[in-house]
Each structure stands twice: as structure tokens, then as C-alpha cells.
């Protein structure tokens, strides 16, 4: 994003299907209102740690609020009335983020708190191991788009509705809010890149398929390794991607170039 764009609202086609190295707040301010169909962001988790690729926010409430309140307000402004937002976050500050979302989007537009569960990592001495991320799901209005995603159900389970009818003759059931069937990013996978906290494509694919249609516009303002943009391109969605780290944008562009 060059200096000429700052302070001027951009028509969406000029920024769609591109990723840019920019402060996400400044980029969002240049996007016209009510233009985005879906926002997914794997936001900063507030650990206070310094990673190889970025420095996380400290878990201090004032710092968290000063960073996220203006950004979430902009996300609300640029989201369509039929749109929805998913913010992925760790358990350390998820309660603060939910309060901000309640204030900006309205608690009545809270749809779900999804738990993405995974294995691996260490075991703390004086606490339960933390083995899930929180994904907060909100809509802008009650007129949002949503399509159930299906998964194979256990042979031990009933796979039935409350009235006893089977969900699907092919042995599938709608995905619920407890996601245990998607593994973390495999470091040996061909999709793996040299970037911290890379999320698996299957995770983002589920969200994009559930809350957008082909040719819709999806935005990720904490792009990281670029997985959201890659999945959008593969699923025929338009996208906007942004990250303040030049390395992230370099990796994302390389991955996008590799998508046929």
C-alpha cells in the first residue's frame, strides 16, 4: 500500500486477490464500508513472547484493548450485512476478545465459540495442558450466510437427529463446535513453510466453505504464512490479505504463485 492510498477509500476490485505488507488498521481504513463477505483472522494470542517471525502482544488488558478495539471496529464497518467473522485466538486472552466483539458486533450476534483441539506440546507442572484454540464466530446481522459442513461420524455413534432420522445415507453428520478431526500443521507436509504458527489448510477450508460462496470476498488481516489466501484461490473465492511482516508476504506470494 503506497502513501497515496492512505486517507482515501479504495474500491474493492483494486485490492482484491492481492496480499500486501502493511499495518492492517491502515489498510482497513482505505476499504469502503460493507464490502467483505467473510473475515477470518488468526490474531495475535497475547503471550508476550518473541517468536522468530513476529513479536506477540503482552497479556495486558490495556494493551490488548488498544490494539484490537480499533481494528475490530474497522472489521465491523467493512463487513457486509450478510457477512460473518471468525477470530482465532488462544485461551489466555480469548475472554477479552469476546468482550470486545460483544461491544462492537453486539452480544446478540454472537454465534458460537468453536474449540479446535489438537495434540502435542508439553505438559505444565501445575496446570492442565492447553490443547485447543478458541475460534469466536460472530455475524454482523441475523441475515448471514451459513452452510453446514459434514464429516464422517463414528461407527459407535448414532449419527441421527433428535427425531431418530439419519443425517445422511453416506454416513456423515454436520460438524459441531468441537473440532477434533483436524490435525495441526504437519511440518513434513509439502504445504509446510518456514513460518511460525502456520495453520492447516483443512481448518481454514472448513470456515470458508461454511460462511462464503464462490466469488465472495474473504479477508485475512493477520495473514501470516498466507494459508487463507491460498485456500481462497483454490476454492474460487476472492481475497484480501495483509501482514506487517515482509517475510510473511514473501511466503504468501510464493505459495499463491504455486497454485495452478
Model-derived segments and spans:
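Core catalytic lobe of class I
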Residues: 1-259
Amino acid at each position: 500500500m503506497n502513501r497515496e492510498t492512505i486517507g482515501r477509500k479504495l474500491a474493492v476490485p483494486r485490492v482484491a486477490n492481492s496480499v500486501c505488507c502493511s499495518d492492517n488498521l491502515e489498510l482497513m481504513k482505505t476499504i469502503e464500508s460493507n464490502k467483505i463477505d467473510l473475515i477470518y483472522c488468526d490474531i495475535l494470542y497475547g503471550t508476550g513472547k518473541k517468536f522468530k517471525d513476529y513479536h506477540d502482544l503482552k497479556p495486558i488488558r490495556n494493551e490488548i484493548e488498544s490494539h484490537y478495539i480499533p481494528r475490530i471496529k474497522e472489521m465491523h464497518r467493512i463487513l457486509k450485512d450478510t457477512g460473518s467473522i471468525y477470530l482465532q485466538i488462544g485461551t489466555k486472552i480469548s475472554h477479552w476478545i469476546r468482550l470486545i466483539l460483544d461491544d462492537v458486533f453486539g452480544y446478540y450476534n454472537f454465534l458460537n465459540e468453536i474449540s479446535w483441539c489438537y495434540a502435542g506440546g508439553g505438559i505444565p507442572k501445575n496446570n492442565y495442558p492447553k490443547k485447543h484454540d478458541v475460534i469466536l464466530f460472530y455475524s454482523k446481522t441475523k441475515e448471514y450466510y451459513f452452510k453446514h459442513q459434514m464429516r464422517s461420524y463414528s461407527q459407535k455413534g448414532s449419527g441421527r437427529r433428535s427425531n431418530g432420522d439419519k443425517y445422511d445415507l453416506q454416513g456423515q453428520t454436520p460438524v459441531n463446535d468441537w473440532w477434533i478431526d483436524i490435525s495441526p500443521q504437519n511440518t513434513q507436509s509439502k504445504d509446510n513453510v518456514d513460518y511460525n504458527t502456520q495453520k492447516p489448510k483443512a481448518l481454514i477450508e472448513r470456515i470458508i466453505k461454511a460462511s462464503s460462496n464462490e466469488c465472495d470476498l474473504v479477508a485475512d488481516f493477520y495473514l501470516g504464512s498466507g494459508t487463507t489466501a491460498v485456500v481462497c484461490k483454490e476454492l474460487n473465492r476472492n481475497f484480501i490479505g495483509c501482514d506487517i511482516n515482509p517475510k510473511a508476504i514473501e511466503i504468501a506470494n510464493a505459495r499463491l504463485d504455486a497454485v495452478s
